[in-house]
UniProtKB/Swiss-Prot annotation:
PROSITE patterns: G_TR_1 (PS00301), G_TR_2 (PS51722). Its EC number is 3.6.5.3. InterPro entries: EF-Tu_GTP-bd, EF-Tu_GTPase, EFTu-like_2, EFTU_2, G_TR_CS, P-loop_NTPase, Small_GTP-bd, T_Tr_GTP-bd_dom. This is Elongation factor Tu. Residues 174-176 are annotated as: G5. GO terms for molecular function: GTP binding; GTPase activity; guanosine tetraphosphate binding; translation elongation factor activity. It comes from Histophilus somni (strain 2336). HAMAP family: EF_Tu_B.
Length: 394
């Protein structure tokens, strides 16, 4: 096949490999880039190029992550792979690499293992919306019944964590054989690619989502009124539109009478832009940093939620000692810190630096939130943990 020209116009989708250590995540990542580059152009990446993952910092946390890119006929994919289990945990919780879908790698020779379960659970907690399964090392299993058994176990495990186990695509393959260029196993990589294209819907772009702007600063401009500034997180705001001010205090409504950027007046502000919004009839003291401007009805304020949290290790600049129930740190959402108390799961007395843990948080002020919102845990301005809202309680 002739190599297709790389089209910037293709929809962009973020995916990643998850699964138990040594089940073949990195080999599969290499195989995907190699097979797809033959068919659709792009660069093949060798195993050791991917395995040698560079260190990154996300919210002050060190994570080793490899990013590769590949194309199918209809889409462009950015794919993240992590060398170690701890890196996955950190990656999923911080949202350093947001995934529109994940490829769960399970070795047919082992079946589901403890980290298989943990990655599925994390996927549920942090809001990975779709999982596709690659049953790896199938060239080493001759027994059809055994393969069916492993498949059944994986489907049951997915269903247990509220993924549609019965409808999840499962590809039986061998990443190593595909990487080595064996045609029948290369075919399985193409099968996987077609599931990526068809099973994972195209993500909604930030600009198409309801308007939201986290407020960073508030100014009073004499003769004109109150201006709030910040970066538009999603959506578009047009002059004359009604917005809600959500979080910390009672929700109120106001109208945006002007949008400006670099001291120029505009008709609208869009996702990704730093803007000032002039608000009608709103007093300077009624608004504060930490609130958000949002499309009316699109987001609500909450104080109590379940979360999945990663606690920084001492080496990452976190705490040197464990914390216990009754711990009262600050929770940093978007632009501000709010104090909160925590509840640990049944039977857990203390949490060590470097652990990841499910905890229930109760904030002293409500914050505009929805499921999947990321936050940092801080003590006196120092980050000691990272978390994600898994479920809103009230």
């Amino acid at each position: 096949m002739s190599k297709e020209k790389f089209e910037r116009t293709k929809p962009h989708v973020n995916v990643g490999t998850i699964g138990h250590v040594d089940h073949g995540k990195t080999t599969l990542t290499a195989a995907i880039t190699t097979v797809l580059s033959k068919h659709f152009g792009g660069a093949a990446r060798a195993f050791d190029q991917i395995d040698n993952a560079p260190e990154e910092k996300a919210r002050g946390i060190t994570i080793n992550t490899s990013h590769v890119e590949y194309d199918t006929a209809t889409r462009h994919y950015a794919h993240v792979d992590c060398p170690g289990h701890a890196d996955y945990v950190k990656n999923m919780i911080t949202g350093a690499a947001q995934m529109d879908g994940a490829i769960l790698v399970v070795a047919a020779t082992d079946g589901p293992m403890p980290q298989t379960r943990e990655h599925i659970l994390l996927g549920r907690q942090v809001g990975v919306p779709y999982i596709i399964v690659f049953l790896n090392k199938c060239d080493m299993v001759d027994d059809e019944e055994l393969l069916e058994l492993v498949e059944m176990e994986v489907r049951e495990l997915l269903s247990q964590y509220d993924f549609p186990g019965d409808d999840t695509p499962i590809v039986r393959g061998s990443a190593l054989q595909a990487l080595n260029g064996v045609a029948e196993w290369e075919e399985k990589i193409l099968e996987l690619a077609s599931h990526l294209d068809n099973y994972i819907p195209e993500p909604e772009r930030a600009i198409d989502q309801p308007f939201l702007l986290p407020i960073e600063d508030v100014f009073s401009i004499s003769g004109r009124g109150t201006v709030v500034t910040g970066r538009v997180e999603r959506g578009i705001i047009r002059t004359g539109e009604e917005v809600e001010i959500v979080g910390i205090k009672e929700t109120t409504k106001t109208t945006v009478t002007g949008v400006e950027m670099f001291r120029k007046l505009l008709d609208e502000g869009r996702a990704g832009e730093n803007i000032g919004a002039l608000l009608r009839g709103t007093k300077r003291e009624e608004i504060e940093r930490g609130q958000v401007l949002a499309k009316p009805g699109s987001i609500t304020p909450h104080t109590d939620f379940e979360s999945e949290v990663y606690v920084l290790s001492k080496e990452e600049g976190g705490r040197h000692t464990p914390f216990f129930k009754g711990y009262r740190p600050q929770f940093y959402f978007r632009t501000t810190d709010v104090t909160g108390t925590i509840e640990l799961p049944e039977g857990v007395e203390m949490v060590m630096p470097g652990d990841n843990i499910k905890m229930t948080v109760s904030l002293i002020h409500p914050i505009a939130m929805d499921q999947g919102l990321r936050f940092a845990i801080r003590e006196g301005g120092r980050t000691v943990g990272a978390g994600v809202v898994a479920k809103i309680i009230k």
